[in-house]
């Protein structure tokens, strides 16, 4: 009897990942099961932590750092439908248009944006640490001949302080504990505490900061605004697999938890008063990726009174705009550290929203859109001719520089285009792939065939001069069985096209000398009957 492993079979479902991502996108647009609200410059976006953490290293660190890698508790008795609360995240350092494009990318695997908004999307992808979007935007900008903008130091500093503030608040909430016997951990809002006063030099301590929360009064669940139709549920296997695709990044976990572990002590009921105390610690210069400057933060502080205000309903026009965006889900997010997976992602097909043509390859959809808009951003500096693609401009510049990169291996001939070399190779190989459908003559080049069809050496004459001659030319009697065959006319092969071709050439050659001489019957029979057919024959008979 075989082992249990021998009885196992694997049934793949290739469309499952895209269908799962499509369902998550539909839930996001309807506001169902969303456990996070992102605010930026007065606009709000409902989304899921698991999807954001799977696509963005920044969000993964924001949701897990200091929380042991667990998902933030949402069972604190919020006022949203379904008895669940939703976290609120303020990201004023990312513009609404760029954030909307990145959220659409996270749920549809398609980055849809305009060429003018490409630098803003690149800046937002750098702040949120989305490697595949950064690589695609850099490739598009470099292909367009534009220089990628440098990261904004103020936004980088605000993003760093925002992340550190959440890590500090989460660590403190975990150490404060919860009384035994209480199953659900309290909801900790995602709104950060007021940032510490700016220091002359931005540093980060080598040791973790010592911070704690002081609680007063009732439970802090009222700090979380109401969210319509929000339900919480444990992560499914597919969502856990999607979150785990990014793996470990940079040493610090990218986390999604802001609640103490189950079974810990609960703080006393009352609004949370965040006070961070830092001890004397050894400091060193912060190690951060190149290009991320350090500057003083100008982010305004948020008081507890402002955080406790009621949430305004989402603008219906905004929901209609989000619903109208491209929704075709193809594949979930990929591991930015895996080059092979990133290469496969760059080859994912994208659909044109205008003509619905499937475009393959990253960065080719904006290039295809220029065919609809008529935009030609690449201009020749010599003659001023404009092109929609940069590679076409480079090929055009060879006409001015004299460069001929395609050389024949059999002779010294060089060519400007690859198809010219391909046609030239027929001369060496003897191949004649272009055949005339009238006279069956073959040619090595297509332009030779076109010249043959338009010239005087084929059955169908199409020159303008021939049409004028046809009007003034005398009408000769049509060919019949009694017409004598001109010299050199071969009718033995039985091809009607060849006969018509030879006959047309014969009439054309005899047009200058007059009509041909025809006989009414065979000369031998006429001589036997004694009926002269020509003046010379009559004179011969009279003399005889």
From Swiss-Prot:
Impact when changing residue 389 to G: In HD; disrupts sequence-specific DNA-binding; no effect on homodimerization or interaction with HDAC4 and HDAC5
Induction of expression: Expression in mammary glands is induced by insulin.
Gene Ontology terms, MF aspect: cis-regulatory region sequence-specific DNA binding; DNA binding; DNA-binding transcription activator activity, RNA polymerase II-specific; DNA-binding transcription factor activity; DNA-binding transcription repressor activity; histone deacetylase binding; identical protein binding; protein homodimerization activity
InterPro entries tied to this protein: BTB/POZ_dom, SKP1/BTB/POZ_sf, Znf_C2H2_sf, Znf_C2H2_type, ZnFinger_BTB_dom_contain
Cross-link (Glycyl lysine isopeptide (Lys-Gly) (interchain with G-Cter in ubiquitin)): 210, 216, 339
Protein name: Zinc finger and BTB domain-containing protein 7B
Residues recorded as bearing Phosphothreonine in the entry: 373
Tissue: Widely expressed, with a higher level in skin. Expressed in thymus. Restricted to CD4 cells (mature single positive CD4(+) and intermediate CD4(+)CD8(+) cells). Expressed in the luminal epithelial cells in the mammary glands where is up-regulated at late pregnancy and lactation. Expression is enriched in brown fat.
ZnF (C2H2-type) intervals: 350-372, 378-400, 406-428, 434-458
SMART domains cross-referenced by the UniProt entry: BTB, ZnF_C2H2
Subunit structure and binding partners: Homodimerizes. Interacts with NCL, NEDD4 and YBX1. Interacts with HNRNPU (via RNA-binding RGG-box region); the interaction facilitates the recruitment of long non-coding RNA Blnc1 by ZBTB7B. Interacts with HDAC4 and HDAC5; the interaction allows the recruitment of HDAC4 and HDAC5 on CD8 loci for deacetylation and possible inhibition of CD8 genes expression.
Transmembrane segments: none
Positions bearing Phosphoserine: 150
Taxonomic source organism: Mus musculus (Mouse)
Annotated function: Transcription regulator that acts as a key regulator of lineage commitment of immature T-cell precursors. Exerts distinct biological functions in the mammary epithelial cells and T cells in a tissue-specific manner. Necessary and sufficient for commitment of CD4 lineage, while its absence causes CD8 commitment. Development of immature T-cell precursors (thymocytes) to either the CD4 helper or CD8 killer T-cell lineages correlates precisely with their T-cell receptor specificity for major histocompatibility complex class II or class I molecules, respectively.
Traits of the deletion mutant: Mutant females are unable to efficiently secrete milk lipid and to nurse the offspring. They show normal mammary gland morphogenesis in puberty and alveologenesis in pregnancy, but are defective in triggering the onset of lactation upon parturition with large cellular lipid droplets retained within alveolar epithelial cells. Mice are more sensitive to cold temperature, with impaired cold-induced transcriptional remodeling in brown fat and diminished browning of inguinal white fat.
N6-acetyllysine found at: 210, 216, 339
